[in-house]
């Protein structure tokens, strides 16, 4: 302590060296003191070596490498989701198909049989089939959160998301929605500001999810010619990439517009404490996954099941005895009599669907969708695919009476390619095909997501608004696409 006092005394007395009459007195004094402080500082400051976790933070929050590392993490996560979720999803799908067939064979023929085998069981299956994706996604998100890395991601993304009316925490739900909007919407609970969370929920379905892939691949193969740009870039792959990019741009622009429309006095502030990096507590990870699955099954599942039964009823019944009469007429046709049992069943299903309530609704909306290049058959697919976007392909298979499951996609593509309008022109052209793809980029064609949005917002107001503005966007951009390419 005596040594420090002597140092301080010398430091003060050293100021007396300077002549106050000197015009540069103050500058010299400041420079001298700065040098003196720099000389004395090492004796007061204790330097410690960087810990391994601190070295990792230099990477995680780096202005450039932090973003690249995050993209790599996302790539690994979605590779796992797409690679491994498909196996249990296929098993769940085949199990519920078996249960539907078992119920159909075991129960007496009639309304109850059809309700259970074609409405209730497929509806429950429509809930359970999403569980593998939800479980895997929240498993990885829980790990990222438990380790402390997720807080770093939120920190680096906030500067990009905030001008759009979003929050750094919005990045996880939006990226999650590229796999499935359902877990994406559910993961917005980490966003504390109501306005930012609501905007994230409203734009999440605009991110192209995996359910859109069957629609995209069928239509791209149908209307986009095979070939390469610059000798190595696949044209069909380029169109697929463009559709994903269109969805992302649409989501971000919509977020900015909603930021200006939705009023909220509370300003969004990102208050974030970066926790220490650590190994995850697996018990907490498992609890998080189970909790998310439970919320989805018991809350959203009830609504999904109800809508499934409604869609089944509308597709199975029609006004008066039109279905019965049309079925009898087709059974008398020469084509029907010469067909195999599978072909006969497909033809009857096609005629029943055409004259059902949904078929009549498809014909009713035909004048509205005709400017987009669609006919009533596409209208039926648009309506039925509200249950889930991937239902689009199955609906077309039923409408066009494609019966051989082993070659379903090839036969469906060939049948659609040969489909003609009343004036003899092809139904599926580059203009109508691209218009349909753009429609699916923006349209809210997923009742499961609607159910989850209702659950998360605690109101039907926002799901209805979401369906409305996404429907308007889908119609407007599909119309623009058709007019440009016609």
Mark where each language-model region is.
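Alpha-helical transmembrane helix bundles of large polytopic membrane transport and channel proteins
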Residues: 1-47, 330-336, 341, 407-418
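Extended, low-charge hydrophobic alpha-helical regions
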Residues: 88-120, 124, 164, 185-198, ...
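Long hydrophobic segments that form regular secondary structure
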Residues: 259-268, 277-329
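Alpha-helical transmembrane segments
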Residues: 236-254
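Juxtamembrane inter-helical linkers in multi-pass membrane proteins
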Residues: 94, 98-102, 106, 151-179, ...
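Short, membrane-interfacial amphipathic segments enriched in basic
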Residues: 26-30, 41-54, 104-113, 274-287, ...
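Transmembrane helix-loop junctions at the membrane interface of multipass transporters and ion channels
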Residues: 213-239, 294, 448-459, 478-486
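Core alpha-helical transmembrane segments of integral membrane proteins
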Residues: 60-155
